[in-house]
């Protein structure tokens, strides 16, 4: 079976958006995704991104499927072509206080607060209070262009932050693990104890 071309992928990943624009008459569509729900350290970051269909950037996919180099190349192009792009961060202290799901929802609501277009597509999160109608789509970051674009923006910003954080706390290897629970990271927590970037509710059984 021949490999899907970049143009074919773009057409496939915008099927939902094009259908909504044509059939339901919405003016524009944004996507929301999050990065960092599972790590032991660092914030959860959400992004809300809307790009006109006439200005779509080739190569967008679920951020987990893209290399760091590819994500970094896409990031400025997405921001340059977006009609709306905003991120929101919830720090470990907030995650510990209200739990990761509530923190993720709060961040999603914050990043979408200024969007005044027609509809928002969300990657598999229900119960949000958003300014316009929205739909939750399972595996949205693999199926919907706008959600995938949001995943790239959120991933790049969070990864850059974790690399900076590694300069302040070099013992945990944040530049490599981005806060996720690798064997190296868990060993460092046990050896050095936690730092302010750690989610205490996530690491208490390692202490």
Regions from the PLM with identified roles:
Residues 1-207:
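RNase H-like, Mg2+-dependent phosphodiesterase core
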């Amino acid at each position: 079976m021949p490999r899907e071309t970049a143009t074919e992928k773009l057409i496939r990943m915008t099927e939902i958006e094009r259908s909504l624009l044509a059939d339901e008459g919405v003016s524009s569509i944004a996507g929301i995704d999050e990065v960092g729900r599972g790590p032991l350290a660092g914030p959860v970051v959400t992004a809300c991104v809307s790009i006109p269909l006439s200005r779509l950037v080739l190569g967008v996919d679920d951020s987990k499927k893209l290399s760091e180099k590819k994500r970094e190349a896409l990031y400025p192009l997405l921001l340059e072509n977006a009609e709306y792009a905003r991120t929101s961060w919830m720090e470990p202290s907030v995650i510990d206080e209200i739990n990761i799901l509530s923190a993720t929802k709060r961040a999603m609501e914050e990043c979408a607060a200024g969007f005044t277009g027609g509809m928002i597509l969300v990657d598999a999160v229900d119960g949000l209070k958003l300014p316009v109608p929205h739909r939750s789509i399972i595996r949205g970051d693999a199926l919907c262009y706008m959600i995938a674009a949001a995943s790239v923006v959120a991933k790049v910003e969070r990864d850059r932050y974790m690399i900076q954080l590694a300069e302040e706390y070099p013992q945990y290897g944040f530049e490599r693990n981005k806060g996720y629970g690798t064997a190296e990271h868990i060993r460092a927590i046990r050896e050095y104890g936690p730092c302010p970037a750690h989610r205490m509710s996530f690491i208490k059984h390692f202490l």
